[in-house]
């Protein structure tokens, strides 16, 4: 037993050593390569399985039910109470001011719009989110914008910023230089249309005859709807009387029947009479006789006059309507209906209270944004950022290059879907509040007036400043514009290749003024400048200013 145990152990050890020597890189590299390949496939399978598991996990989650189960109104009310109590809103103000000081928000906006990949992602997100807007009630948002004044502050800060008009003008100039107004697609473009002609019958050849088969005569007769022989009606009445045992003489097929109906309205009722039915036979249709609620046998049809008393019918129906039923079931139903009306009133009140929670929270947040410097710094960053300006030009180029399809898409849009949005906007009072604030803002009116005058009267101001100079100084004209206008005429003043790099600005202005006063010649530099700027200039600068004005008004809207 002991010898067999030792022998078995030695044999197992030798087998293990021999197996280790077989699987070595030197002895079997192919086996190692296969093993590495199998490991790669195993990793791929494991990665694929992991993705499938994650995908299945996300697909099994019902996001709609989760979102619907969230009580947003209660959460909004709790959050608003947390912000307004103990003046905790100061923390939100500090956070927004910090974001404004770091320029993080405008940098993110500029980067997302200037980068092609991120811009495409933003566009896809916006397109996917548009259908969800119709399921959201925008009234709390509009009311919060009005109560907080955020909408007006945004537009007013944009207009009051001194860099807004130069930004708009530069965008328009870049568009004009690039020739991006692709109006050819709208006015001069070519289009092809294929029309398939459908063969239809002319109205003159449409058969309007409808055949009616009258089975009262000895033989079947087909007659047109436009030429029906009224004698067939007499035949029908005659056959009806024959079927009920009255053997009166049948009316001939060629009988001419004349019917006259008169209606008489009195306080008692209305009498309907059918008179003057004369034929070659014995039948005389005088009228219908009998009470209104009593049926008349066919054998008595047309025998004696009949008076239909509609007043009696109205009295009966009125009595039935006024009758009260002592029904326990109906009383219980009325009681339940009253309770449901009370429950509906409570639900409406709760719904309004919950909607007020959302409005209060949005108003609190929007008011904090309006108080902070976030809007002002964001606008200042964007209107002075060259990358953002290039992005705006690029986006407008794409719009104008496809203006034909853009207008077609606008015309084909179902604008009726925006009716709830427009109604919410009008009912919120945001527009009236915005207009009222604008009319009462003296600073805004002054800025608008200065912007308009600076655009349309730039050349006049330039000329007036030169003419009105009295002490060699310029009061309101930018010195850079003045130097740019006269630099080409003053090469002799500096003596260094016609530039003003080394000439003092005050000395330069005094020199020009002294030259104008002493020489009084028509060839002076100032007079040359005046003659060049006299009249109205309709060059590219004029058109660019016009487009800049339109762009400014568009941004205001």
Curated annotation (Swiss-Prot):
Q: Which cysteines are joined by disulfide bonds?
A: none
The UniProt induction remark is: Up-regulated upon milbemycins A3 oxim derivative (A3Ox) treatment, upon interaction of cells with host macrophages, and during oralpharyngeal candidiasis. Repressed by alpha pheromone.
Q: Which residues form a coiled coil?
A: 320-355
> Source organism lineage?
Eukaryota, Fungi, Dikarya, Ascomycota, Saccharomycotina
Q: What does this protein do?
A: Predicted GPI-anchored protein which may have a role during host infection.
Residues anchoring lipid (GPI-anchor amidated asparagine)? 533
Q: What is this protein called?
A: Predicted GPI-anchored protein 17
Glycosylation site list: 62, 116, 284, 309, 376, 471, 520
Listed GO CC annotations: plasma membrane; side of membrane
Q: Which UniProt keywords apply?
A: Cell membrane, Coiled coil, Glycoprotein, GPI-anchor, Lipoprotein, Membrane, Signal, Virulence
Q: Give the signal peptide, or none.
A: 1-19
Q: How does it sit in the membrane?
A: Lipid-anchor; GPI-anchor
């Amino acid at each position: 037993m002991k010898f067999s145990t030792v022998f078995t152990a030695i044999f197992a050890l030798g087998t293990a050593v021999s197996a280790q020597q077989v699987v070595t890189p030197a002895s079997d590299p192919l086996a190692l390569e296969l093993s590495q390949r199998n490991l790669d496939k195993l990793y791929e399978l494991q990665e694929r399985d992991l993705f499938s598991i994650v995908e299945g996990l996300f697909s099994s989650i019902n996001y709609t039910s989760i979102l619907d189960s969230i009580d947003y109104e209660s959460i909004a009310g709790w959050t608003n109470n947390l912000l307004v109590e103990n003046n905790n809103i100061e923390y939100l103000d500090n956070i927004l001011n910090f974001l404004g000081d770091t320029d993080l928000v405008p940098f993110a906006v500029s980067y997302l719009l200037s980068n092609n990949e991120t811009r495409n992602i933003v566009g896809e997100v916006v397109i996917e989110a548009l259908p969800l807007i119709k399921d959201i009630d925008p009234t709390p948002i509009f009311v919060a914008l009005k109560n907080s004044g955020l909408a007006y502050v945004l537009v007013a800060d944009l207009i009051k910023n001194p860099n807004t008009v130069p930004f708009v003008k530069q965008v328009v100039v870049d568009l004009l230089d690039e020739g991006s107004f692709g109006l050819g697609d709208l006015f001069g473009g070519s289009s092809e249309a294929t029309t398939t002609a459908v063969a239809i019958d002319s109205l003159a050849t449409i058969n309007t005859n409808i055949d009616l088969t009258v089975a009262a005569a000895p033989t079947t007769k087909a007659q047109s709807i436009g030429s029906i022989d009224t004698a067939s009606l007499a035949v029908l009445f005659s056959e009806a009387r024959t079927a009920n045992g009255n053997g009166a003489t049948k009316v001939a097929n060629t009988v001419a029947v004349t019917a006259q109906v008169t209606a008489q309205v009195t306080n008692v009722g209305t009498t309907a009479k059918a008179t003057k039915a004369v034929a070659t036979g014995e039948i005389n249709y005088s009228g219908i006789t009998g009470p209104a609620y009593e049926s008349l046998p066919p054998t008595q049809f047309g025998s004696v006059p009949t008076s239909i008393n509609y007043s009696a019918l109205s009295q009966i129906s009125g009595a039935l309507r006024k009758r009260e039923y002592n029904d326990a079931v109906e009383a219980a139903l009325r009681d339940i209906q009253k309770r449901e009306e009370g429950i509906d009133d409570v639900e409406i009140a709760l719904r309004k209270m919950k909607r007020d929670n959302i409005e209060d929270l949005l108003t609190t947040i929007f008011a904090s944004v309006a108080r902070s410097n976030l809007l002002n710094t964001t606008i200042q960053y964007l209107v002075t950022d060259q990358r953002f300006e290039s992005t705006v030009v690029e986006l407008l180029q794409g719009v104008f290059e496809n203006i034909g399809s853009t207008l077609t898409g606008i015309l084909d849009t179902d604008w009726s879907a925006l009716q709830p949005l427009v109604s919410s906007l009008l009912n919120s009072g945001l527009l009236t509040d915005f207009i009222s604030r604008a009319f009462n803002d003296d600073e805004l009116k002054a800025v608008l007036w200065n912007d308009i005058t600076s655009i349309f009267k730039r050349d006049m101001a330039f000329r007036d400043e030169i003419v009105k100079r009295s002490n060699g100084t310029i009061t309101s004209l930018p010195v850079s514009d003045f130097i740019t206008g006269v630099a080409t005429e003053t090469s002799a003043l500096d003596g260094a290749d016609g530039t003003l790099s080394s000439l003092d600005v005050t000395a330069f202005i005094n020199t020009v003024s002294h030259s104008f006063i002493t020489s009084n010649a028509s060839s002076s530099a100032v007079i040359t400048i005046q003659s060049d700027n006299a009249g109205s200039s309709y060059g590219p600068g004029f058109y660019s200013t016009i487009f800049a004005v339109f762009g400014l008004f568009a941004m205001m809207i």
